[in-house]
Amino acid sequence: YNIGQIAAGEFQFGVAQSDWQYHAVNGSSKWQGKQYSDLRAVFSVHNEPFQIWARKKAKIKNFSDLEGKVVNIGNPGSGQRGTMEELMKAMGVDNSFFKSTTELTSSEQVKALCDGKIDAFGYSVGFPNGAMEQAATCAAKASPINLTGPEVQGLIDGADYYAQAVIPKGTYTKQKKDATTFGVKAT
């Protein structure tokens, strides 16, 4: 969203994920045919690991456990949605892999998880994060899952803007293990 507003001249400055900045500058992915080569990063703010949070009762420990579950893939046009789609492509799945998908915004997904309306959601966000703490402490007793394996490593190796990331144990209430994933930087 912010990159589009800058490109349209509506914003002079904005924060974006480094992967979407890369795509805008290079005219790739959703920016194909709309290259914005004048876009510049002023600085990197923090790491934003891509996190999939799952309710405890859903028994989701890794990506393959999402099969047949209700998963929020993010609202159309969001960085959250774009990263989830790239991960799904790397894993060789589409929406039919899940029981169903939702397109909730980042501000709606934690309530849906806590209310039992979804089993999991994916989100690129720095840590610690208040909304993720809410997911960990509500009735869902959610936690971040590991995103590892050759498909994820291929995703990291194939993109200059991705790197391995770890959410250290104890970052969130009752998080007893490190969660290994991948991520970007906010620029």
What positions do the PLM features span?
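Short, solvent-exposed loop/turn and secondary-structure capping segments
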Residues: I3, V25-G27, T83-E85, E133
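A glycine- and small-aliphatic-rich helix-loop capping segment at beta-alpha/alpha-beta transitions
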Residues: W31-G33, A90-M91
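Bilobed "Venus flytrap"/periplasmic-binding protein-like clamshell domains
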Residues: Y1, S44-D115
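Loop/turn elements at helix/coil->beta-strand transitions in domains of secreted/extracellular proteins
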Residues: E10-Q12, S37-D38, G68-K69, K117-D119, ...
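Extracellular/periplasmic catalytic domains that process cell-envelope and extracellular macromolecules
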Residues: A7-A8, G33-Q35, S44-H46, D65, ...
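Short beta-strand-centered segments that line the small-molecule binding cleft or hinge
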Residues: F13, Y22-K30, S37-H46
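Pocket-lining segment of extracytoplasmic ligand-binding domains
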Residues: S18, S29, A58, N95-T187
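Extracytoplasmic small-molecule ligand-binding "clamshell" domains
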Residues: Y1-A7, F13
